[in-house]
């Protein structure tokens, strides 16, 4: 009888210890050990236009959705989209015109989100340039043909009546194009911020009244079809990153300083861009797509689908974005 009592006491003691272990080391520690899907995510510029994915990465928004994201900088939107088409990356935030041009040529990719609804860039010139017509025959620095800087430069030149009258020179990436301007290899540069301390703003592209998304978040059709939850996680984390930028300024300034360091300027300047241009609800707007189609001479009905706002619209309908800005749980 005593032996039975001792045995029962031992069992109770073991049971109590087991319960204590469970409470001391809760289930979330085991959840954290679960394998996360590895994602390669390309971004195409060292620019505050990319800050949404930087903040999503730094704040852990991707990880909370089971995604281990490796951000890959590829200098120029056209090259980033080539990497997506070639299967080197799972997702890319790159030049909207490069995404649309690739789709029109048959690339099996689709845009699922964007970042701006107007061109948050300006035409910066050397101090001696006083009027737009002085750019006739002059050189303008861009990253690469097919990039956002290339496309917006052409938009501005068309508006100014200078299309085909100025030379566009490729320098490679955003930093390289800035250096080209500072070393006076170019008289002008279209960029989201001043390419150098002596640069003077001649035209603010945002004031031209042109609907335009600077970048589109694109994935392959195959990945979207086979891994819809992963794509939704990417988009939701990206939207959360934008919200965090706008609602947690001290943290946002640190992230901007970290990623924008190569280009100079102050974190406050970059933050002003974020709050002014990045859309809280980053839908792909048909009018912005139409701007690109007009520039590339595309008319008539399209044979392929360029964008799908299904994920963003669903997140809006579920109140996800509202909660982010009201301090609720995502």
What feature does the model see in each segment?
Residues 27-31:
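Sec/Tat signal peptide C-region and signal peptidase I cleavage site
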Residues 226-304:
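Secondary-structure end/capping motifs
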Residues 55-56, 121-130, 213-230, 277:
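A bilobed periplasmic-binding-protein/Venus flytrap-type ligand-binding module shared by bacterial periplasmic
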Residues 1-12:
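N-terminal secretory signal peptides that target proteins for export/translocation
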Residues 97, 175-260:
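Pocket-lining segment of extracytoplasmic ligand-binding domains
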Residues 14-26:
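Bacterial N-terminal signal peptides
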Residues 32-193, 200-211:
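Short, glycine-/small- and polar/acidic-enriched structural segments
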């Amino acid at each position: 009888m005593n032996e039975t009592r001792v045995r029962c006491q031992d069992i109770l003691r073991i049971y109590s210890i087991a319960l204590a272990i469970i409470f001391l080391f809760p289930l979330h520690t085991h959840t954290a050990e679960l394998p996360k899907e590895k994602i390669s995510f390309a971004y195409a510029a060292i620019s505050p236009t990319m800050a949404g994915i930087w903040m999503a990465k730094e704040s852990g928004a991707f990880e909370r959705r089971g995604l281990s994201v490796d951000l890959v900088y590829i200098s120029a939107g056209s090259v980033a989209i080539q990497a997506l088409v070639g299967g080197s990356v799972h997702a890319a935030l790159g030049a909207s015109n490069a995404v649309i041009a690739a789709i029109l040529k048959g690339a099996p990719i689709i845009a699922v989100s964007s970042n701006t609804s107007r061109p948050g860039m300006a035409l910066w010139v050397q101090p001696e340039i006083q009027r737009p017509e002085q750019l006739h025959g002059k050189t303008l620095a861009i990253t690469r043909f097919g990039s956002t800087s290339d496309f917006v430069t052409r938009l501005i030149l068309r508006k100014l009546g200078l299309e085909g009258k100025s030379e566009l020179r490729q320098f490679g990436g955003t930093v390289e194009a800035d250096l080209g301007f500072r070393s006076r290899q170019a008289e002008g540069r279209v960029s989201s911020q001043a390419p150098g301390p002596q640069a003077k703003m001649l035209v603010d592209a945002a004031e031209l009244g042109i609907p335009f998304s600077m970048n589109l978040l694109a994935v392959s059709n195959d990945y979207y079809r086979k891994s819809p939850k992963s794509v939704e996680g990417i988009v939701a984390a990206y939207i959360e990153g934008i919200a965090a930028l706008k609602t947690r300024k001290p943290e946002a300034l640190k992230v901007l300083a970290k990623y924008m360091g190569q280009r100079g300027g102050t974190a406050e300047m970059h933050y002003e861009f974020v709050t002014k241009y990045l859309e809280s609800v980053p839908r792909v707007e048909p009018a912005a797509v139409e701007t690109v189609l007009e520039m590339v001479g595309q008319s008539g009905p399209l044979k392929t689908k360029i964008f799908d706002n299904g994920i963003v619209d669903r997140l809006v309908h579920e109140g996800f974005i509202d909660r982010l800005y009201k301090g609720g749980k995502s």
